[in-house]
UniProtKB/Swiss-Prot annotation:
PROSITE patterns: RIBOSOMAL_S12. InterPro entries: NA-bd_OB-fold, Ribosomal_uS12, Ribosomal_uS12_bac. With S4 and S5 plays an important role in translational accuracy. Located at the interface of the 30S and 50S subunits. One of its GO terms (biological process) is translation. This is Small ribosomal subunit protein uS12c. One of its GO terms (molecular function) is rRNA binding. It is found in: Plastid, Chloroplast. Its main location: plastid.
Amino acid sequence: MPTNQQLIRKARQRLESGTKSPALRGCPQRRGVCTRVYTTTPKKPNSALRKVARVRLTSKFEVTAYIPGIGHNLQEHSVVLVRGGRVKDLPGVRYHIVRGALDAVGVKDRKKGRSSALQSIVATRIIATIPYQLF
């Protein structure tokens, strides 16, 4: 315990809290290439096969990122956008893959979590990606 005189001479150092997503290097998202896509099991009280991918980012980090939603089209060499955000029951998974950006398509037939304005945008985007031979 320092004395008052010691504190006057040299003030207490502020504790700097480290970032929870160091691989993003202060950016909101980073682009990366999937090196491995696989499933893993969560921690003790939960039971499932969670879909995750090992991603090599443009910042030269290789991270494990969670693939949210039901079903995905990702495979090795897919280019994805990675954001921060951990998965509580998967140790070591501190990043999420952004659905609907780059090679990761949005969740098929998603009903919830869409405003009426966004529904029309998503519908036109889906129609725009369908080749003309199908019409």
